[in-house]
């Protein structure tokens, strides 16, 4: 429950900040990285005078890896909601980019039981991630991002102290590519 409040508060700060100031903003599509599969994101600097910014997105996730959840499903698909704070290094059109965030996901998992019947169930989970990459922003508004996104599962516990069966991956390194438009 604490993560949900944190995500909601951070999302409201990013969106409300964008509504009241004129600064560099962008929409971009991301392949892999924090999106896991494919996502659409909004990114904005917190003011005209800072290199600090944030992003919020929605992503479709699809995996046939049995390592995604502790229950080892044969297929996982669903929606995730990455949110992050980032910092741009450098001036002009070429930037190094570092960021830290979390992604919360709602997933549908499928496996076959011992009798061969297909069993489907819903679950949720979250993972923390870093963005370590390069960002190019052209004068015409085109933005390109490439880099690595190390991530680690954030374990959750119920009221009795037992670990929930959320995202179970050990540390992973997802490459990412993003293309979008600055305005």
Feature-to-residue mapping (PLM):
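Short N-terminal segments immediately surrounding and downstream of signal-peptide cleavage
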Residues: 23-36
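Structured catalytic cores of enzymes that bind and process phosphorylated ligands/cofactors
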Residues: 88, 103, 149-152, 171-174
């Amino acid at each position: 429950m604490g993560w949900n409040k944190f995500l909601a508060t951070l999302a409201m700060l990013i969106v409300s900040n964008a509504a009241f100031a004129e600064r560099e903003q962008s929409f971009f599509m991301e392949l892999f990285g924090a999106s896991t599969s494919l996502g659409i994101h909004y990114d904005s600097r917190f003011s005209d005078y800072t290199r600090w910014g944030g992003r919020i997105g929605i992503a479709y996730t699809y995996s046939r890896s049995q390592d995604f959840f502790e229950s080892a499903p044969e297929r996982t698909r669903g929606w995730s909601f990455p949110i992050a704070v980032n910092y741009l290094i450098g001036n002009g059109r070429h930037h190094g980019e570092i960021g830290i965030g979390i992604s919360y996901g709602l997933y549908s998992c499928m496996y076959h039981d011992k009798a061969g019947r297909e069993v489907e169930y819903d679950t949720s989970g979250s993972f923390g991630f870093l963005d370590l990459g390069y960002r190019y922003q052209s004068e015409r508004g085109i933005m390109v991002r490439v880099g690595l996104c190390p991530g680690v599962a954030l374990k959750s516990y119920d009221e009795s102290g037992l670990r929930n069966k959320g995202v179970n991956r050990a540390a992973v390194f997802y490459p990412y590519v993003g293309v979008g438009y600055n305005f």
